[in-house]
């Protein structure tokens, strides 16, 4: 076996189950492709095996303790090298996943992963969220995003994709509370409500806060605005 990773206990401890052999094989293959293609596609600063499995793979899954994932239609906005979207697909093959990123290099890499891992019901699209959201209005049960933008920015980029009562899940770092305070009630304007906050203790790879929103009503026509406008108003990227 090319990879030496064997600390599967950390997955069991944090998720409550041991990944199957098929899941382990697919994660190992994903890690191999990530490391092999990293220089060419400029994917991640983290390449050490233990770190990738914990800081990228496991971190992409911790939110699933708070919400049941089965066959939902999910969009991962600003997926980069596939976090959390590819990892979710490996663990929950019944999902229907769309990965989007504005950087076409990432999309080329994701298509290699999808092909080599023989993943089904998953598509990688080169698109900007604020543009695609107008085309794919209210199409998704879940929109998810990790480390893409400041809270008020990502809320506006993501909300139109969701069906009414759809969930927006934001995988955030320790400053999520500060971002909520600074978001100037944009959630009310966007007709979306914070329903749950998952604070994860620092188990050696940084404190994480995952935010769960629910869409209450259709998105007002104004949103999302052009990216430059959103960022200008936010004052944050
Ligand atoms: C810091 S990376 C995070 C990647 C991945 N989600 C992760 O957790 O490692 C942010 C990604 O979001 C993408 N991105 C930024 N703004 C975007 C937008 N408006 N629409 C689509 N993708 C965007 C970037 O190209 C980049 O790949």
From Swiss-Prot:
Localisation per UniProt entry: Cytoplasm
Residues noted as binding S-adenosyl-L-methionine in the record, renumbered to the chain: 78, 83, 129-130, 146
Disulfide bonds: none
Pfam families associated with the record: GidB (PF02527)
One Gene Ontology term of the molecular function aspect: rRNA (guanine-N7-)-methyltransferase activity
Keywords associated with the record: Cytoplasm, Methyltransferase, rRNA processing, S-adenosyl-L-methionine, Transferase
Record carries keyword Transmembrane: no
EC number assigned by the record: 2.1.1.-
UniProt record similarity statement: Belongs to the methyltransferase superfamily. RNA methyltransferase RsmG family.
Cited function: Specifically methylates the N7 position of a guanine in 16S rRNA.
Protein name as annotated: Ribosomal RNA small subunit methyltransferase G
Source species of the chain: Mesoplasma florum (strain ATCC 33453 / NBRC 100688 / NCTC 11704 / L1)
Gene: rsmG
């Amino acid at each position: 076996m090319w990879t030496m990773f064997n600390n599967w206990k950390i997955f069991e401890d944090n998720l409550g189950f041991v990944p199957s052999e098929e899941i382990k094989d697919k994660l190992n293959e994903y890690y191999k492709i990530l490391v092999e293609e990293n220089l060419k596609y400029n994917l991640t600063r983290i390449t050490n095996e233990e770190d990738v499995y914990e800081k990228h793979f496991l971190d992409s899954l911790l939110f699933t303790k708070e919400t049941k994932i089965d066959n939902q239609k999910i969009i991962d906005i600003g997926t980069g090298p596939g976090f959390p979207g590819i990892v979710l697909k490996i663990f929950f093959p019944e999902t229907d996943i769309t990965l989007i990123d504005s950087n076409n290099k990432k999309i080329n890499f994701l298509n290699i992963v999808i092909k080599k891992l023989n993943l089904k019901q998953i598509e990688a699209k080169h698109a900007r969220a604020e543009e695609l959201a107008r085309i794919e209005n209210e199409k998704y049960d879940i929109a998810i995003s990790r480390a893409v933008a400041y809270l008020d920015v990502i809320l506006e980029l993501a909300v139109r994709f969701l069906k009414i009562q759809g969930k927006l899940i934001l995988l955030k770092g320790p400053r999520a509370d500060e971002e909520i305070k600074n978001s100037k009630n944009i959630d009310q304007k966007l007709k979306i409500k914070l329903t749950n906050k998952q604070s994860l203790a620092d188990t050696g790879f940084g404190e994480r806060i995952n935010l769960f929103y629910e869409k209450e009503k259709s998105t007002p026509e104004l949103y999302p605005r052009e990216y430059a406008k959103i960022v200008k108003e936010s004052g944050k990227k």
